[in-house]
């Protein structure tokens, strides 16, 4: 295993640490790559680089012009993820990719154990016992593991569950297959305890999508029937979903979106850069929030029409690589995992913005860039 491959695995470990440590750790890996003359060429050959770094450059200019210093800092995160994505593309191999997925699955176990510890502490502090499994509505009283908040951790779990499906297909060892199922179920249990309702929505699609991509037709049809049964059960008994009776957060989102549209109407072309909502809402006495809680609205709000077009151009180029590479033919399970990641982001994005953090942003970015392993040379 080369040094670059070892650095990829080290960076993977950093993703499960608090975001401050993760950011510094990945930055150090990029510095060593630059010193070894590995980074510049990687960026030059990065798919869609002109759109990605054109967008980042635009956001630096916009955030400075509007003194949006939170957004300025957030833009440096885009640089970090973009540069690491370039280094990843240059360094990743098929064998290292499988090891990386297994490492993520193993690390998720420790994150989940810590999440259970948090849940126990929160329960005791609020006069409850662990076995009551009472999930509070307050974000401060919900488990986050090593991540910023419950919803970000929940998205990480969504990604991990998809990886468990991927490795279940790729690994022929029966004991390993059983292990992946156990880890996925354990993570799903902890996901339930996060109280993130949004994170449960993708499960209505990711199983059929993945099974269709790996061409398991009978299981694909079975999964659709089971999904419909689960949806019917939830319809008949909504209390199965945690915090389902609390609609205050959805009412808050309506207020947030109304405030966001006011800002969009005033600054439609460029916005104010990342986290525009956080800077704008006090000016119109809007509902307090760090972002617009919808990636579609937040994209137009923060980046404007011009910035959003650049993001869409990059997304188009990256998806073109995914669909024109040999990924679907040579590794349908990886193609299925990519489609599931896209589905998770699109569904999750209806009610939240959870990609603007190093763990979720980097993890999603590198998986969607993994088709580079199957490009025709």
Protein language model features and the residues they cover:
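Hydrophobic transmembrane alpha-helices and their immediate junctions
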Residues: 35-39, 174-179, 204-212, 220-223, ...
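Transmembrane alpha-helices of multi-pass inner-membrane enzymes
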Residues: 27-34, 162, 335-377
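Alpha-helical transmembrane segments of multi-pass inner-membrane proteins
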Residues: 98-131, 135-138, 145-214, 235, ...
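N-terminal signal-anchor transmembrane segment
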Residues: 1-38, 55-66, 345
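Long extracytoplasmic/lumenal interhelical loops at the membrane interface
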Residues: 240, 247-258, 262-266, 270-303
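A membrane-periplasm/extracellular boundary helix in multi-pass inner-membrane enzymes
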Residues: 113-122, 194, 211-250, 258-266, ...
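Membrane-interfacial loop-to-transmembrane alpha-helix junctions, especially the N-terminal start
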Residues: 2-7, 40-54, 97-101, 176-180, ...
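Transmembrane alpha-helical segments and their membrane-water interfaces
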Residues: 33-40, 59-115, 160-163, 347
């Amino acid at each position: 295993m080369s040094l670059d491959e070892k650095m990829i695995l080290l960076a993977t470990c950093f993703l499960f640490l608090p975001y401050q440590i993760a950011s510094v750790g990945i930055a150090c890996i990029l510095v060593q790559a630059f010193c070894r003359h590995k980074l510049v060429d990687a960026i030059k050959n990065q798919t869609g680089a002109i759109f990605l770094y054109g967008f980042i450059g635009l956001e630096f200019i916009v955030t400075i012009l509007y003194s949006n210093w939170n957004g300025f800092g957030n833009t440096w995160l885009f640089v970090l993820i973009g540069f690491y994505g370039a280094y990843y593309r240059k360094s990743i191999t098929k064998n290292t990719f499988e090891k990386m997925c297994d490492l993520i699955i193993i690390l998720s176990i420790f994150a989940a154990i810590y999440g259970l510890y948090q849940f126990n502490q929160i329960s005791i502090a609020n006069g409850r016992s662990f076995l009551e499994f009472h999930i509070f509505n307050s974000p401060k009283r919900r488990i986050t593991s090593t991540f910023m908040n419950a919803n970000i951790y929940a998205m990480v779990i969504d990604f991990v569950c998809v990886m468990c499906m991927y490795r279940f297909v790729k690994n022929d060892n029966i004991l390993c297959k059983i292990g992946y199922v156990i880890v996925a179920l354990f993570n799903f249990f902890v996901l339930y305890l996060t109280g993130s309702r949004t994170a449960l929505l993708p499960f209505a699609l990711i199983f059929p999508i993945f099974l269709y991509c790996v061409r398991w037709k009978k299981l694909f049809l079975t999964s659709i029937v089971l999904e419909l049964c689960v949806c019917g059960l939830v319809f008949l008994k909504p209390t199965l979903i945690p915090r389902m009776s609390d609609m205050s957060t959805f009412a808050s989102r309506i207020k947030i979106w109304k405030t966001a549209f006011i800002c969009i109407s005033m600054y439609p072309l460029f916005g104010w850069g990342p986290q525009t909502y956080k800077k704008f809402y006090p000016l119109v006495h809007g509902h307090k929030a760090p972002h617009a809680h919808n990636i579609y609205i937040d994209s137009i709000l923060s980046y404007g029409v011009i910035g959003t077009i650049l993001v869409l151009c990059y997304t188009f180029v990256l998806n073109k690589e995914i669909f024109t590479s040999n990924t679907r033919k040579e590794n349908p399970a990886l193609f299925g995992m990519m489609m599931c990641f896209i589905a998770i982001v699109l569904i999750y994005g209806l009610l939240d913005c959870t990609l603007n953090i190093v763990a979720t942003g980097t993890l999603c970015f590198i998986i969607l860039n993994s088709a580079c392993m199957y490009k025709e040379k």
